[in-house]
Amino acid sequence: MTTTSLGADAAHTHAMVPSAIPPEGSDAAGPDDTLMQQMQAACAQACRAIAPAWPLDRAIAVNPHWGRVDMPVRRVAARMAVLGGIQVFPTRRSQQQAWVAGRITPADLADALAQLPAARAAGLTEAKCVEALRRHELPPRLPLLIDVLDNDPQRHTRLSWRQAITHQVSQTCAAYFDVHQADWQPERADGLYGFWRDTLQHDHGIGLLMGLPDLGRRLDALPATPLDAEHWALNQLGLPQPVWADYLEAVLLTVNGWASWCAYLGWQAAQEGREDPHLRDLLAIRLAWGAIVQECRDDASTRMAFAALQAEWQQAPSALAEAEAALLVDEVWQLALEAGYQRQLAHRLAGAGALPPVPQDIEVQAAFCIDVRSEPLRRALECVWPAVQTIGFAGFFGLPVAYTPLGTAARRPQLPGLLAPTMEVSDRIDAAQGPDGMPDPAAERAAERARRHRLGASAQVDGASRWPSAAFSYVEVAGVGYLGKLWRWLRPSTEARSRADLTGLPSRYRAVCRPHLHAESVETKAALAARVLRAMGLAEHLAPLVLFVGHGSQTSNNAHAAALDCGACCGQTGEVNARSLALLLNEPPVRAALQAHGITVPEDTVFAAALHNTTTDEIEGFDLDRLPPAARARWDHLQSVLKHASDQVRRERAPSLGLDPRAPHDDLLTQLRRRANDGAQTRPEWGLAGNAAFVIAPRHRTQGVVLDGRSFLHDYDASRDHDGSVLELLMTAPMLVTHWINWQYHASMCDPVHLGSGNKLLHNVVGGSIGVFEGNGGDLRIGLSRQSLHDGQRWIHEPLRLTVLIDAPETAIERVVDKHPIVRQLVDNGWLHLWRFGPQDLQRYAAGQWRPLTSRHATC
């Protein structure tokens, strides 16, 4: 399609664009193949730009710009500003505050200018950068069709068309995708587009609300398929073909929340080897809405607005280029903010040992998740008892599994969202407690029946309270039973964390209900165990007690509770993975089979599982009845160590939660438990707020260093990784996961309106677990709430890009960067910083070369 030349008057421009909706079943000739291919390519390109958003019950952090990381950060910032009015870099107002407060120093600004060749080429100086902070506005956004149509003389007498369309599309999606909340489910046979079309044709009030009395008649002729709707709407616009994809991406950004949900459905489908049409359907719906409104308006103001739209989009390439140039100063300030943190980080790491300490007798090895909340506890534990060696590893512990709780049909992934499960874990009931407990099929069947009965009864009660015919009578009969709930709300308990996976299971079975990994053979189990132990660095020198410590949170009345659990376990706690792995490695046949893989597990080595409650910093052990006497004695001794270490961490965290760090141990724990069980508490913990670095190195590089709970820590010993395969795994899995986490926090803070979920107090859950509305409408909200980032007086998080530090040879790191395009994109396009531990100092990777840090940074 060639560029449409604009005529002098609007009427002529409007006449050039076909405006009649093709009737269904018409014999008109279709578009030529080339035009259709171009349209399909533009739609596909726009859809690829949308990152997925996981449901609430599997909430994991995602970089909302994931579909754009093949471009430099500043170019993405320009596109998001011009196409969606979205802020990518920290606001200039916040940077000005950091400058005035001294958080960003002149040295930081000079360092940022030195790092950015484009800034030097553009003649930017420190004075010019400071002057730019006085101008706070984003580059102007290009309008969409509905924007120019909405800006008519009668706009104050009716509902805003853009808001009305967003609301209608959002409510339609909420009804269509809901499978948990409504008792009466919609008809989905015709897909999302067909459902929307049918819903709109039966909504006789929306035309009056929008001031479009002719809307109903126009709707009768809507194209029957989403493909026809896309072609019709694009043809209606008459825009030049080179800007189609940009315009379509801008259209999707108006319903970015639902687009992200549809992208998640597409992500899941791709993992299963199939396609999902929902994102294309949503694009067709949003495109068609603009064309419908245009059809209903045919006056001078509409024609002038349409001509203005075409004129502005003719200039889209230059608008994007101008925005990219204007945002250069924002990139400088982003680097300056990061330079201050990086200087402090380098200085602290310089105090750690460059060489491993002299080996001593290790009583306990404890593998923790790499999560930033594990760092303070690991440091405290090593300080309290030097005979403990802590290890950092991804919290799913290398198990590519999905878990099915006993007596349920639920199946949930327990691994990073980047991966698909290839193995299964389910619960088993043992005949009795103790080291020699064997499976008891009869007890398992009885437990399943009892659980199904209890869960079924609970579902019936819930259902009775929702039906219109029973709602009032239910309150009369059962209302008094809610007095206990009301009391617990008014006076939150100080109970320890409850285990949701045991809901409905009779108490007599709980102690003997254990998750077990299913595998075809002992050899399959042994091969998996060998890979995990080698990746953890535990293929040799095993301690008598090896502990796998997953983590989970404890909150009440929190729609985003899963976001505080383990991201590596797909928004679940790490309990299932830790227990499954420990039980697997304690199986005698598996230990014997490990010999063939070159791993000898000493007879006195026992594996155990535990969970770190990140809200209260308590440690809970599992399957302790399976421990032999010697291992149980070590565990019992470890309890006093854990108590002291946990108390130290709680005192570190107390000021950020408004608590007194000098309070007695028991009082502080009680206060944290009460916060965790308080349904009105919007900030039970800070999650991963403050995250800024990822260290892939032996523990001695960070041991004893106070990293303030801001660093992900993954153990890695390059001397044992002869072929670089472990490093490759770490840079293509955990590094991507930490990048996703880092950018979700970054985006939610830089633009909380578009990329955050707003105010927790106004959240309403959509579809049971899909997401939330802020209030009762608008787009689906994605990202983090304001309360996850701000304490009411100040921001807890700083929007810094992740600094990744690796202790490995230059060539090994470069080999991974060169082999994997996604890693190359993240590094070269400025989505993260890549550093390494050099022989004498820290080195930064830039423009394909390793360069020592400036003299302003400390050496290691």
From Swiss-Prot:
UniProt membrane topology term: Peripheral membrane protein
Residues involved in Zn(2+) binding: C369, D371, H551, C566
Quaternary context: Forms a complex with DabB.
Protein's recorded name: Probable inorganic carbon transporter subunit DabA
Pfam families: DabA
Role summary: Part of an energy-coupled inorganic carbon pump.
InterPro entries referenced in this protein's UniProt entry, alphabetically: DabA (IPR018752)
One GO MF term: zinc ion binding
Cofactors that this protein relies on: Zn(2+)
Statement: the UniProt record of this protein carries the keyword DNA-binding: no
Subcellular location per the Swiss-Prot or TrEMBL entry: Cell inner membrane
Family: Belongs to the inorganic carbon transporter (TC 9.A.2) DabA family.
Segments of this protein annotated with the region Disordered: 1-32
GO cellular component terms attached to this protein's record: plasma membrane
Keywords: Cell inner membrane, Cell membrane, Membrane, Metal-binding, Transport, Zinc
